[in-house]
């Protein structure tokens, strides 16, 4: 089974990628920075760029995507000057990945180490 893991520059994505490799799975890791300390093949990817997401996932052609990338500085995420960027990454980036997975009939798992809303709220940021 082949995986594409986002957010391998962070703690969760890094650990997920290492565990997959340890278990003998094939995988490609991604994150925003140009290079990342990982034993897996790596590609730099801005998940807010819909076209780049489609190209990356299509080129890798994974059986599943494990989406760990996110804006994780929770306190800074609530600052007015960061709201648009946080939404672009955490909502828009996730949508980009989900849309490509749907198009390619590729499974997607979204996991987080921090705040995840239950989806029952009526407005963003007021879950």
Give names to the regions the model predicted.
Residues 1-23:
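N-terminal Rossmann NAD(P)H-binding glycine-rich loop of SDR-like oxidoreductase domains
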Residues 6, 30, 65-69, 108-113:
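SDR active-site strand-loop-helix element
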Residues 21-36:
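Conserved glycine-rich Rossmann-like NAD(P)H-binding loop of the short-chain dehydrogenase/reductase
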Residues 23, 60, 100-104:
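Helix C-cap/helix->beta junction micro-motif
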Residues 33-50:
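Rossmann-fold cofactor-recognition segment
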Residues 47-89:
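NAD(P)H-binding glycine-rich loop region in Rossmannoid oxidoreductase-like domains
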Residues 84, 88-95, 103:
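Conserved internal alpha-helix in NAD(P)-dependent oxidoreductase domains
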Residues 95-127:
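Conserved Rossmann-fold NAD(P)-dependent oxidoreductase catalytic core, especially the SDR/UDP-sugar
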């Amino acid at each position: 089974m082949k995986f594409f893991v986002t957010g391998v520059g962070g703690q969760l994505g890094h650990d997920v990628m290492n565990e997959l490799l340890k278990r003998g799975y094939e995988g490609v890791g991604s994150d925003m920075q140009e290079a990342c300390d990982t034993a897996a093949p790596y590609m730099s990817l801005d998940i807010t760029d819909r076209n780049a997401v489609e190209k990356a996932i299509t080129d890798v052609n994974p059986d599943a995507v494990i989406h760990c990338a996110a804006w994780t500085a929770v306190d800074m995420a609530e600052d007015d000057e960061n709201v648009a960027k946080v939404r672009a990454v955490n909502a828009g980036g996730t949508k980009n990945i989900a849309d490509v997975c749907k198009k390619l009939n590729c499974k997607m798992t979204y996991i987080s180490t921090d705040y995840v809303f239950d989806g029952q709220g009526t407005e963003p940021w007021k879950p």
